[in-house]
Amino acid sequence: MRSKVVWAALATLVASLGPQVVAQRGATASVPDERVKALVDRLDLERYKVTIKGLTQFGDRRQGTDRNRAAVDWIEAQLKSYGCPTERIRYEFKTPPPNPNPNPAGGAAGRGSVPEAPPTSAGGGRPRGIRTRTSVNTDPNAQPDARVRALNMQPATDGPREEVYCTKVGTTRPDEMYIIGAHMDGHGWGEAANDDGSGTALVMELARVFSGSDVETDRTIRFALWNNEETGLNGAAAYVAQRKDLQGRENPPGSRRFPEPKWLGMIQHDMMLFDHGMPLPDGTMRKEQRLEADVNIEFQSTAKLSGEAQALAWAWHKANERYATDYPAKVGNHMTNTDSTPFMDVVPSISVRENERGTEVGSGWDPQWHQPTDLYSTYNDQDFRLGLNAAQTSLGAVAELTGARIKR
């Protein structure tokens, strides 16, 4: 039965592409469409790095601080400079009481115990290999760089929050939309360069390319930079709560203007740079990106729209084969703890990232995660290139699904 659901979802997805995009899929499905490749080629490693570096001027961009608000303003100014008109979501945030059971999934059992069943990570996956403890650094003195430490000194306070998005309106189907997201906030007393400066910069670079004056799309694309991810996906959840019931409404009637087009898919980008493999037996990490590094594409098998989300994930995988220059992609079914989660029962949703979120990142495979070492200077061009390959993958997939092309 599940296979029938998946194939039905695939058929629905293909049907949604329109004749222009379907026609480009021949017997050799990995052959790129030259119109799409021309857009992908507008991505540039140095520009991607410059955007990440620009985000790090605001330290860890912790929500509820002046540095976070300044980062939102900076992101909005960049999006406007690309020609992508912006809007903001506004909501209130109050710190919830501490969770008395922060790890209900259990995690790994102690080495000396005999569990009744294999342990599972967040999202439902089974952790394997060498694991190290993870945590969120809250000690300012753990940051040895006085400049970065000073940037991050202001504590967070509860109250009003804002996040920014911009929109590329489609020409023939402005009433249908893909949402491309990343979270711009961080914590840990570093620069949040990877988590999630790398995803934020990726989304901004896609906004730059698609907002080119010579680029048009059939369908609408929204580029959203969520806030309050680190406190529980609050910014993305606020967007869903405020906007999901507005989908497809033409306002004013007869205008062909759709403030919230019908959602066709939501694609999140979170931590794009670091795939150095599992920790070594002594708990240290390899200094270089592993030769087998890949872009991870995850959907959640328990979501109400899991069949459609799986189809979307494989569309991203195919785009990676067509347009990514260096690193392949891998599809998994344990998407979790990321801003696509509030969307997953409303619209097909996937997450694009460096490692599997639950089984690998959650097992300590990225030692910079929420730590003072998440600095721009920590990463090298091999790391940044993994992020660029994720950008190539997403830009190629979005371009195909929205009928994007360069006007002649």
Annotate each predicted stretch with a short phrase.
Residues V50, G54-T167:
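A non-catalytic alpha/beta surface segment that caps or lines the substrate-entry region
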Residues A8-L17:
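Bacterial N-terminal signal peptides
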Residues E34-L43, T56-R69, A150-P155, D185-G197, ...:
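Second-shell loop/turn segments in exported
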Residues W226-D339, D345-S349, E356:
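Metal-dependent peptidase/peptidase-like ectodomains
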Residues Y48-T56, T86-R88, E163-T167, M177-G181, ...:
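Structural recognition of the beta-strand scaffold that forms the well-ordered cores
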Residues V40-R47, I52, T56-Q63, I75-T86, ...:
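Sec/Tat-exported extracytoplasmic proteins
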Residues G358-R408:
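His/Asp/Glu-rich mid-to-C-terminal helical/loop segments that flank catalytic regions of hydrolases
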Residues C166, I180-N234, S394:
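Alpha-helical metal-binding/catalytic segments enriched in His/Glu/Asp
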